[in-house]
Amino acid sequence: MQYSFTEKKRIRKSFAKRPIVHQVPFLLATQLESFSTFLQADVPATQRKPEGLQAAFTSVFPIVSHNGFARLEFVSYALSSPAFNIKECQQRGLTYCSALRAKVRLVILDKESPNKPVVKEVKEQEVYMGEIPLMTPTGSFVINGTERVIVSQLHRSPGVFFEHDKGKTHSSGKLLFSARIIPYRGSWLDFEFDPKDILYFRVDRRRKMPVTILLKAIGLTPEQILANFFVFDNFTLMDEGAQLEFVPERLRGEVARFDITDRDGKVIVQKDKRINAKHIRDLEAAKTKFISVPEDYLLGRVLAKNVVDGDTGEVIASANDEVTESVLEKLREAGIKDIQTLYTNDLDQGPYISSTLRVDETTDKTAARIAIHRMMRPGEPPTEEAVEALFNRLFYSEEAYDLSKVGRMKFNRRVGRDEIVGPMTLQDDDILATIKILVELRNGKGEVDDIDHLGNRRVRCVGELAENQFRAGLVRVERAVKERLGQAESENLMPHDLINSKPISSAIREFFGSSQLSQFMDQTNPLSEITHKRRVSALGPGGLTRERAGFEVRDVHPTHYGRVCPIETPEGPNIGLINSLALYAHLNEYGFLETPYRKVVDSKVTDQIDYLSAIEEGRYMIAQANAAIDEDGRLIDELVSSREAGETMMVTPDRIQYMDVAPSQIVSVAASLIPFLEHDDANRALMGSNMQRQAVPCLRPEKPVVGTGIERTCAVDSGTTVQAFRGGVVDYVDAGRIVIRVNDDEAVAGEVGVDIYNLIKYTRSNQNTNINQRPIVKMGDKVSRGDVLADGASTDLGELALGQNMLIAFMPWNGYNFEDSILISEKVVADDRYTSIHIEELNVVARDTKLGPEEITRDISNLAEVQLGRLDESGIVYIGAEVEAGDVLVGKVTPKGETQLTPEEKLLRAIFGEKASDVKDTSLRVPSGMSGTVIDVQVFTREGIQRDKRAQQIIDDELKRYRLDLNDQLRIVEGDAFQRLARMLVGKVANGGPKKLAKGTKIDQAYLEDLDHYHWFDIRLADDEAAASLEAIKNSIEEKRHQFDLAFEEKRKKLTQGDELPPGVLKMVKVYLAVKRRLQPGDKMAGRHGNKGVVSKIVPIEDMPYMADGRPADVVLNPLGVPSRMNVGQVLEVHLGWAAKGLGWRIGEMLQRQAKIEELRTFLTKIYNESGRQEDLESFTDDEILELAKNLREGVPFATPVFDGATEEEMGKMLDLAFPDDIAEQLGMNPSKNQVRLYDGRTGEMFERRVTLGYMHYLKLHHLVDDKMHARSTGPYSLVTQQPLGGKAQFGGQRFGEMEVWALEAYGASYVLQEMLTVKSDDVTGRTKVYENLVKGDHVIDAGMPESFNVLVKEIRSLGIDIDLDRN
């Protein structure tokens, strides 16, 4: 088994019972794949598939002018490389994007040419089409300097859907069926029955019209319409009555209205008897072809065809007319014998289309189309062209209507066709097929669709959403181009004169900047980043809205299995509308979610893995991942629990066709990080998965002792750690950079065999948490590709580490852990276990105002020297300065408007100069309630403005760092080259050289070492071939030096050019403060099982409950928090964590007494290989075993995978191994070793009962009391009501609401009440009066009129009631 560099250092013991069949796929794959399909940047222009940008271009181009003599064709497009890299874009507030240029061809045809079109001239040119934001390697976008994520959207798939209203519309509870054809873009077409069973259609939810209008509009006559929907009864008219052609199945179940006889007149069915199967058999036996029926049997039936008099050509009766006695008379007169009527019955053949035809007043195709035109464009005159154009544009035009590949596939599948491809517009037979199925449904045949089935909902990813926006922009451009193409020839225009890229740029900018699906990335910790990118939302443009979404859409559906997580979704109004992808889920080419299954053949599980979509899955019998199998992969049990079409049942193994790949298949990343998830109630698991995303990265991350084994995947895929691109040897490491000399076999010939990784140091995340990377390799370490070189925020040795492992005791403690409060030991705070660093960005801009430019300077009058002490000569604070609320960070003055001066002031000005008074101090100060250390300053200066010293110094430092990187690369390149050179030169014969090297001498190592390396090139060799390769090496080194000089020059140019700043801004300074937040009462904390609480007290270490050996607990939780919430997983985690730490202490004790390596090996084998997944400890050298043991002293990390975790028995074994009987007895443990005797820290007395004690991974959440604490003395007031504003952001007051007023009223505190309602709220004169009184030392309140009373008076007046105050 292969262990990576970091895995070797600390193996996580897994309790999984099942081997890993299928690796967890790369977690950000959906985002990255979708966007690369959209761009197709690395694909040669000729080989691009018709998707993404290519599809958008080809769908809009060629653009033809109105007269048809000029057209603009699209050839190909290209993306330039971005001007700034990701980091520079973040610092400068720019968008990380690339310029899109399209090569287009303008073709002008000769108007004079009499016969077929002749090309007059062709112009080809590259045209700038706007900027396209690029995705970073971690799946986010940098827009205006901030990282954003485009969330995937789950929307209704295009296609056709049949449903009914569940009996809610009509009071009788009758089911009203409806169908809807949804295109990808274009008009929606709905069909619906009304309570009278007449079928209507509507376009885009407009007025409804009888469906036969649409059928006539597509060219069907009433006869053809009836022929499409009904079967006919054939009658032959006799002198008396008629003969009915006998069709057995149409008679069954009917009541005979007359005696039915056979040929010989024998009665087979008596009158008023129901016809049953025996009667029909008798009729068939009698070889009945016709049945004689009386005249009245025909009355009320409906004719199927027009009946025409053969002689005169007169229409006697039309199709869909009822047969009446007069009609029969006319028929007999005209001598017509054979007539056809519609066969209908009340059970399964209703007369719906026939009755609809009756309601329909249109006569022919033209009239029908005019009716549709009136409905779509009321008020417009229906000219022939307009009517035709509108009807064709609705469903038949490729520009306006697109069913899309998905829509066509879904449509054909639903109407039962075999082929899944076809035209992208609607066809006549599509409309007919839909109506037929709808009528069948009304007749009681077939099933309606389930809209919440994942086969009917598809995911639109970044690429597709961006493509739609881009196409929208292109369509806007197309309109403008069409206008100008007419003038192209006469004015000799080039393609770039025709195309204006503004509409495209603005469409793209609007989408990435302000669309509902483009969200500010949640960057609190690595897990929140991953989860945000894997999120699937039903909201957004073209999706649902919170208010309209009902219960069904939000609910968990059987098809979510393995595709969408049933647990992770937000609490509150968005519940169920925002979901997370399951661990193994993947999108197919149509955008439907698929999940992998193992193929089972003849009850034997094979290695073949198939991805099935929700529709395909419904056809198979699928076993769960925990089904028992033997070594050969055969299913052992007689009955296996399995699913088919969403139902769970027990079946025999031979019926199983597929099996789940892993037990964790059904949950998302966040939920699969919860150990013992299977023992938690789902509601609490939901809170647990949501709260892990809010965990603040601690100063020293600590791996969870009880994990699930997915932590490493999570940390590595999130991109917060640094991974090696290529294997090699670590050449140099410091806190900020790692240099790796690449292995020869991985280096590409001719390129620098050096990888330099610059680490991110103390950078602010979107949520103001700190992102900092720390190297975990040493010089000389051998690393291979993909190994973790540096830990990021919240990762520890390449594993996700969101919190800290705390020793937790479940017991009450003097009411301090009442109602989920948390009691914490002072030691936790003293050890900085939960200390986190938050970085605040403060910026100030110097603008050019009407009265002159603002200036950033140290020279500010009327500020004490103390306040300016931390500023340098440019007026900007030093890095490293510790500042508090109100301190000046950047000095800035703004010119003030000239005021009318008194003569005295004029005199003073004339004497002392005028600088002092005409500017006001607008410096950047630290906001209230904030303090910290300045860790970075950035200065941006507009092009053409003199840089100050500070800005210049920042640029020089940056260049120095870059030069260092280049020198390292050069050093390694030259080192390699000279090593190769030495190997080549030693033993060669020389013709001469430096230091008087005689001709014919053999070169040896000593001679080379004596020379300076560069003089080696002066050696003249006898061997021509060797001389040539000497020259080649010299040239390659010089070439590299030249390249490095160019790169440095490029960097210098980039840094020294002016910065792009918003209009009117001359200079911008950003100051970054690092704020240290220690744990304090009021902070919110939580475990991973939804067990959240607020710190109530931090207790001195001596007062905490302690064990017999004197070790105190870290955290005391209330045991009452467990039973009612049913999250028992936390108790199991505590037991297993106790064992993990116990094993660590035993390993530590062995290392301390310097036990033999063999003893360590035996103990480790006992831990790792006696249960759960086996580890290959044999392959470890003694040194590696020793390093592993050293890393395990703080606890052996366990992995208990979701739904496949540690059993009670395994936990028992681990506890026995960790606490031998002598230690257990000393600590006063119970027989199962999971409870301990504790002593009260304040009295020293032993508690009566043993206490559950152990280690739990506990998190500090991003709800810190520091961010919420707020106090106000005087502050801003609302304009109308004159009451103080609310909230911390507005520096507002506390609301004294209705109920609080009642409390004072009930108490009778009239004086306090008056003060609250007047001077402390909105009595304007009163509040100034109070201030005056206080200054005078007179403590009385003169309460006046509250402003809100005036507002009330004004409101009453607005109703037209004159109300006035009698002020006497």
From Swiss-Prot:
Classification via SUPFAM superfamilies: beta and beta-prime subunits of DNA dependent RNA-polymerase (SSF64484)
UniProt KW keywords: DNA-directed RNA polymerase, Nucleotidyltransferase, Transcription, Transferase
Pfam families xref list: RNA_pol_Rpb2_1 (PF04563), RNA_pol_Rpb2_2 (PF04561), RNA_pol_Rpb2_3 (PF04565), RNA_pol_Rpb2_45 (PF10385), RNA_pol_Rpb2_6 (PF00562), RNA_pol_Rpb2_7 (PF04560)
Gene Ontology cellular component annotations, sorted alphabetically: DNA-directed RNA polymerase complex
GO MF term list: DNA binding; DNA-directed RNA polymerase activity; ribonucleoside binding
The keyword ATP-binding is annotated on this UniProt entry: no
Top enzyme category: transferase
Gene3D superfamilies per record: 2.40.50.100, 2.40.50.150, 3.90.1100.10, DNA-directed RNA polymerase, beta subunit, external 1 domain (2.30.150.10), DNA-directed RNA polymerase, subunit 2, domain 6 (2.40.270.10), RNA polymerase alpha subunit dimerisation domain (3.90.1800.10), RNA polymerase Rpb2, domain 2 (3.90.1110.10)
One record GO biological process: DNA-templated transcription
Superkingdom of the source species: Bacteria
Catalytic reaction(s) noted: RNA(n) + a ribonucleoside 5'-triphosphate = RNA(n+1) + diphosphate
Keyword Nucleotidyltransferase: yes
EC id: 2.7.7.6
HAMAP family given in the database record: RNApol_bact_RpoB
PANTHER family: DNA-DIRECTED RNA POLYMERASE I SUBUNIT 2 (PTHR20856)
Function: DNA-dependent RNA polymerase catalyzes the transcription of DNA into RNA using the four ribonucleoside triphosphates as substrates.
Family that this chain belongs to: Belongs to the RNA polymerase beta chain family.
Oligomer and partners: The RNAP catalytic core consists of 2 alpha, 1 beta, 1 beta' and 1 omega subunit. When a sigma factor is associated with the core the holoenzyme is formed, which can initiate transcription.
Protein's name in the database: DNA-directed RNA polymerase subunit beta
Encoding gene, per UniProt annotation: rpoB
